[in-house]
C-alpha cells in the first residue's frame, strides 16, 4: 500500500560556508554511492523466489508522516513466534543511495534464518540532522513491537 508521504519540515540551517561545504561533500558522496549501486547491481548473484518482498509505509511519531520500508518474508516460514531483523542500512545517516541496496543481504538473512527482515528508509543528514534518523529507527522498532 503506497501512502503519500509528507516531507517533514526541514530544520533551518544558517547558510554558513561550513554548511554549504557540507552540502557539497554530501552531494559528492551520494553521487558516488549511486554510481557504486549502478555498477555492482549487475554483478550480484540472482536471488531465489523463496522470499516475498512487500513495500510498506508505517506511521512516524510525527503526525501525517510515514516511513518507507521493505519487508522480506520467507515463503515457507514456520508458524509460531517469528523473529524479526531490522536492517539499518550503512549510509552513515547521510546517503540515500543505500536504502534497498542491501536487498541480496536481506534475502539471504530472511531465507537462511527464517525471519522477517525490515529494511527501513530513515531520514538523512544534513537535511535532517541527528537525532531525527535515530528517531525513525526507534519508530520502526515500535511499529514492529506493535505488530
Where are these regions (language model features)?
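Catalytic nucleophile-loop/oxyanion-hole region of alpha/beta-hydrolase
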Residues: 97-105, 118-147
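A fold-wide structural signal in alpha/beta-hydrolase
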Residues: 84, 114-118
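Short beta-to-alpha linker loops that shape the active-site pocket of alpha/beta-hydrolase fold enzymes
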Residues: 75, 91, 121-125
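Membrane-embedded segments
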Residues: 94, 109-110
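Short beta-strand element of the alpha/beta-hydrolase
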Residues: 69, 81-92
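N-terminal cap/lid segment of alpha/beta-hydrolase-fold proteins
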Residues: 33-80
Amino acid at each position: 500500500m503506497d501512502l503519500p508521504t509528507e516531507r517533514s519540515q526541514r530544520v533551518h540551517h544558517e547558510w554558513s560556508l561550513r554548511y554549504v561545504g557540507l552540502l557539497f561533500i554530501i552531494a559528492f558522496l551520494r553521487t558516488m554511492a549511486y554510481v557504486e549501486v549502478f555498477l555492482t547491481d549487475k554483478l550480484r548473484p540472482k536471488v531465489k523466489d523463496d522470499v516475498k518482498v512487500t513495500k510498506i509505509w508505517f506511521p512516524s511519531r510525527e503526525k501525517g508522516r510515514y516511513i518507507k520500508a521493505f519487508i522480506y518474508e520467507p515463503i515457507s516460514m514456520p508458524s509460531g513466534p517469528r523473529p524479526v531483523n531490522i536492517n539499518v542500512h550503512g549510509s552513515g545517516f547521510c546517503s540515500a543511495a543505500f536504502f534497498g541496496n542491501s536487498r541480496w543481504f536481506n534475502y539471504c538473512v530472511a531465507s537462511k534464518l527464517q525471519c522477517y527482515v525490515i529494511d527501513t528508509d530513515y531520514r538523512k543528514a544534513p537535511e535532517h540532522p541527528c537525532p531525527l534518523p535515530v528517531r525513525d529507527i526507534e519508530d520502526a522498532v515500535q511499529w514492529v513491537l506493535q505488530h
